[in-house]
């Protein structure tokens, strides 16, 4: 009898371990990224760039530059620089990061200053109904994002459609 009890306990431990591993794996896929920089670079990994070193321009907020550089993926070739709204038209930035403008201002800038392919990302546009193509927002202990399909189309940057699944996953993560 003791043999069968030990065998049963070992079996139960294995089942509990497998359930725990499965639970942890599912959480790792659904948990939002921990900061705006990781979330931004995760999104950018789904983009197809016409250059090997895309230019990421932070609009009107040079204080974020050091954090973007520190959080950039190890083998990335992003050229990260601050620019003002007045410099956008001549910047030819492939990525525009907005952090302190309204959605209305973002949309105006995209319509009036950007006449080249550029992907726009904002962490100050929670509704994401106009303005940037990708809108980051705080969710629980991390960040999630929404996608504005009109702005994404306007960006003229090819994005792998799997990013839509990532957005849906980040939206539904508890």
State each model region's role:
Residues 10-13, 29-174:
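Short hydrophobic alpha-helices and adjacent helix-cap/hinge residues
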Residues 4-16:
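Bacterial N-terminal signal peptides that target proteins for export
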Residues 18-24:
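Bacterial N-terminal signal peptides
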């Amino acid at each position: 009898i003791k043999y069968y009890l030990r065998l049963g306990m070992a079996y139960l431990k294995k089942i509990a371990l497998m359930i725990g591993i499965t639970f942890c794996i599912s959480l790792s896929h659904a948990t939002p990224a921990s900061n705006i920089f990781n979330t931004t670079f995760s999104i950018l990994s789904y983009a197809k760039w016409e250059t090997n070193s895309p230019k990421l321009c932070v609009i009107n907020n040079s204080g974020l530059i050091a954090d973007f550089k520190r959080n950039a993926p190890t083998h990335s070739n992003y050229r990260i620089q601050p620019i003002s709204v007045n410099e956008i038209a001549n910047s030819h930035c492939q990525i525009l990061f907005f952090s302190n403008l309204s959605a209305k201002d973002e949309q105006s800038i995209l319509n009036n200053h950007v006449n080249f392919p550029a992907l726009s990302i904002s962490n100050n546009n929670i509704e994401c109904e106009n303005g940037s193509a990708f809108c980051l927002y705080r969710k629980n202990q991390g960040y999630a994002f929404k996608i504005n399909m009109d702005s994404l189309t306007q960006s003229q940057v090819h994005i792998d459609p799997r990013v839509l699944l990532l957005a849906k996953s980040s939206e539904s993560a508890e």
